[in-house]
């Protein structure tokens, strides 16, 4: 088994000159023929602490937004922190800050064109199980046998229906269809494409629950432009949607110490995508909708650091494509709330998502956030993913 030095825990409570730097750790990576997947490196967060300004995450065109980091000496008015049963005061404070930050940002809700027929959002909330059947480590989708997985899925769907009866739940299975790898493979792209037969298998599971199917792309050293078109035969189906994961998009960068351009392999550092990458995916999906008379597609973009998505204000919305920025970092409740505030609320795009990790979120003894606790956020996430 290969070992990669991974970033796993954010340094908390320190002043951020650029970003708080996580501590180093190690995790085991499967051999090249086995998908590495998000479970091996996922959840590295550099969210500010509750008392740290978020200067690097100021939303575009929102100079009137309070506490976006323009003035690090500015003080919040006193807050009465509500008691959230079973949570610490730190958790509650982070929640209050996230709720207030979203409420005071004049760019929420995002103004968009008239909704097209068949659009899923905002009239529904998508609840998704994430992973890959080839690995138990990459998420709940592959952790349990299909029947057990779907039974657990049913329970989560019921819980969200009870928590918010006013917003119908739309079930979804979220398959990592292109999986980042720790080794280069034959073409040196550090990614593995899943077979059509595997995608069809998960599609058959989704059909049992009248669920959507999301195809998630971790490009490694490839590109969105190279990987997504291969999925077009599936994306032509009305119930199939797309997700792209900047964490595993390993673009060339200048190593200032060595004075050379380098491209890290997946897991060695957190990757990045630009608005150009997102806009390409939007255009491709929009063309498919138009050419095939399909209902609007949903595009999920994962994010848990500022630099994972650059130029968010330049993302060009299209009524044929509904864009979700999904906060997919793991950790204690306060860190997840802070990350949602800093990396999703601070740069409004269109709709928001929130990821829950059955294992990583509970490592330190914290119970998994409940639907009711997630729904306290403002804006309320309309895409919920379980890993």
PLM regions: where:
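Loop/turn elements at helix/coil->beta-strand transitions in domains of secreted/extracellular proteins
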Residues: 168-169, 207-212, 237-241, 293-298, ...
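Aromatic-lined carbohydrate-recognition surfaces of secreted/lumenal glycan-active proteins
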Residues: 219-224, 290-308
